Curated annotation (Swiss-Prot):
This is Ribosome maturation factor RimM. Residues 100-173 form the PRC barrel domain. GO terms for cellular component: cytoplasm; ribosome. It comes from Geobacillus kaustophilus (strain HTA426). Keywords: Chaperone, Cytoplasm, Ribosome biogenesis, rRNA processing.
Length: 175
């Protein structure tokens, strides 16, 4: 592992689940079914450790609003208890390529949103995933928030390198 590797959060272990080594995870990944696939490598970062702990996903299932994961070689609650509160991360090299028009959350958060007329709306601070399409929460300069749906009719251009997004606001969107 390269010392200068960039790491990306994919989840937070908030508790154990049952007695067979499952952990309850609040997912922070755009692609949980891909990221938590059996056989995938994840890295556990605990505050007091200097090096991450590499684990291999043994199983993944969704229960209520949590992702439940188990790892190879960690078969009881006693094995995973110490992971409570830890972050699950992957190195940048593990992110993989996306199709055109798809972006990782970290590429969108922090982008400046501008209308096609050149008016600056604000910066994306959060991404909501309520259903059919993502919704970007944009912090305006006056501190208020605008909700921008990630749909073709509204989002005209995304430039992650320049950290800019150009939109065509629908009537009433920015009021």
């Amino acid at each position: 592992m390269k010392a200068m590797e960039r790491w990306f959060n994919v989840g937070k272990i908030v508790n154990t689940h049952g007695i067979r080594g499952e952990v309850r995870v609040i997912s922070r990944t755009d692609f949980p079914e891909e990221r938590y696939k059996k056989g995938n490598k994840l890295y556990i970062f605990r505050e007091r450790d200097t090096e991450p702990i590499e684990v291999t996903v043994k199983s993944h299932r969704v229960h209520k609003s949590f992702d439940l994961l188990s790892f190879e070689g960690y078969d009881s609650i006693n094995d995973v208890e110490r992971f409570k509160g830890a972050m699950l991360k992957v190195p940048e090299s593990q992110l993989g390529e996306l199709a055109e028009g798809e972006y990782y959350f970290h590429e969108i958060i922090g982008c400046t949103v501008v209308t096609e007329g050149g008016e600056t709306i604000g910066a994306v601070k959060e991404i909501l995933t309520p259903g059919a399409n993502d919704v970007w929460v944009v912090r305006r300069e006056d501190g208020s928030e605008a909700l921008i749906p990630y749909i073709d009719e509204v989002v005209l251009h995304v430039d992650p390198e320049r950290k800019t997004i150009i939109i065509r606001p629908m009537e009433g969107l920015l009021e």
